[in-house]
């Protein structure tokens, strides 16, 4: 049975994923499936760099604004929702395009991980807790950074209990799979967008400034007023830096600087993760104009999907 064709656009924040995905959707009659762990939450728009109505240019986007910030969202749940969206898109004769930066979520979509409930591994938990005592909290947190940078960015190193739990999930999953080497669920073409560090960091700094001007502080104030302060969602980069400013603990300049710093560090970890976890086509989005970089992607997608006779 022929697998469903899917295009996947991944990369660090501010590299140009959103624009690339939309241009491909316009060219190939596609729809976007968001692969971002924060954009699923309603009201978390500016801090997650959620696509605006103007930016979307009429292209449908899926898995955005599907739950509240205090709702649970696991990898298994995301996999189920994303695959349902992809199946629906393809059934209507459209091209599914996954766009995002949450590598663990995207891998769960692309590969045949079959999730079942997993009991707590007490031996593993004891070993991780022992490592925290012997090597220290920072060292334990660094292990999580290497395995799951997205999750690590939401947990403070001093919160050993949550670091240990996150490591358990990263090493075993909330669930277990029936295959240690899962097969590919889709016939996909994956592109990793990247740029030289200096160029990428400059874009990140500019994006943060634009987010602050667009009302990120006011967005965080609204979320706090709605009672979401202590939710997992509010520990995401873009929100955890602004909360101390809103609460009068740090200055606005300090909050802005922290957000830039954390976003740059996260982008570096994302690229490292993509390099080790995805076998894709790397596209430099910094040295050439967007048009030239996009044309390389367009030409590849056009050739790849000729065999499906979709276009």
Swiss-Prot record:
InterPro entries: Dimethylallyltransferase, IPT, P-loop_NTPase. ATP binds at residues 11-18. Its EC number is 2.5.1.75. Disulfide bonds: none annotated. Keywords: ATP-binding, Magnesium, Nucleotide-binding, Transferase, tRNA processing. GO terms for molecular function: ATP binding; tRNA dimethylallyltransferase activity. GO terms for biological process: tRNA modification. It holds the Pfam family IPPT. It catalyses: adenosine(37) in tRNA + dimethylallyl diphosphate = N(6)-dimethylallyladenosine(37) in tRNA + diphosphate. Substrate binds at residues 13-18. It is an enzyme of class 2 (transferase). Coiled coil: none annotated. Residues 36-39 are annotated as: Interaction with substrate tRNA. NCBIfam families: miaA. Belongs to the IPP transferase family. This is tRNA dimethylallyltransferase. The lineage of its organism: Bacteria, Bacillati, Bacillota, Bacilli, Bacillales.
């Amino acid at each position: 049975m022929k697998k469903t064709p899917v295009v996947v656009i991944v990369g660090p924040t501010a590299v140009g994923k959103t624009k690339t995905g939309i241009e491909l959707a316009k060219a190939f009659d596609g729809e976007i499936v968001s692969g971002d762990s924060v954009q699923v939450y309603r009201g978390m728009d500016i801090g997650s760099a959620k696509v605006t109505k103007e930016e979307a240019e009429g292209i449908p986007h899926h898995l955005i604004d599907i739950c509240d910030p205090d709702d649970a969202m696991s990898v298994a749940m995301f996999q189920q929702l994303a695959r349902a969206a992809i199946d629906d898109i393809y059934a209507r004769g459209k091209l599914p395009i996954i766009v995002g930066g949450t590598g663990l979520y995207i891998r769960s979509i692309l590969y045949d991980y079959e999730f079942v409930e997993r009991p707590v591994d007490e031996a593993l938990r004891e070993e991780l807790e022992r490592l925290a005592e012997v090597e220290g909290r920072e060292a334990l947190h660094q292990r999580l950074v290497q395995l799951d940078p997205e999750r690590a960015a939401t947990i403070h190193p001093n919160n050993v209990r949550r670091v240990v739990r996150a490591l358990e999930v990263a090493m075993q999953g909330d669930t277990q799979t029936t295959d240690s080497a899962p097969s590919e669920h889709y016939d996909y073409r994956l592109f990793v967008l990247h740029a030289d560090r200096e160029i990428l960091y400059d874009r990140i700094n500019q994006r943060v400034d634009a987010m602050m001007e667009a009302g990120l502080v006011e967005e965080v104030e609204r979320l706090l007023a709605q009672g979401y302060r202590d939710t997992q969602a509010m520990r995401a980069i873009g929100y955890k830096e602004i909360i101390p400013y809103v609460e009068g603990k740090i200055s606005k300049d300090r909050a802005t600087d922290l957000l830039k710093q954390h976003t740059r560090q996260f982008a570096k970890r994302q690229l490292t993760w993509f390099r080790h976890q995805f076998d894709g086509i790397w596209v430099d989005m910094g040295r050439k104009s967007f048009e030239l970089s996009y044309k390389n992607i367009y030409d590849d997608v056009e050739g790849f999907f000729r065999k499906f006779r979709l276009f």
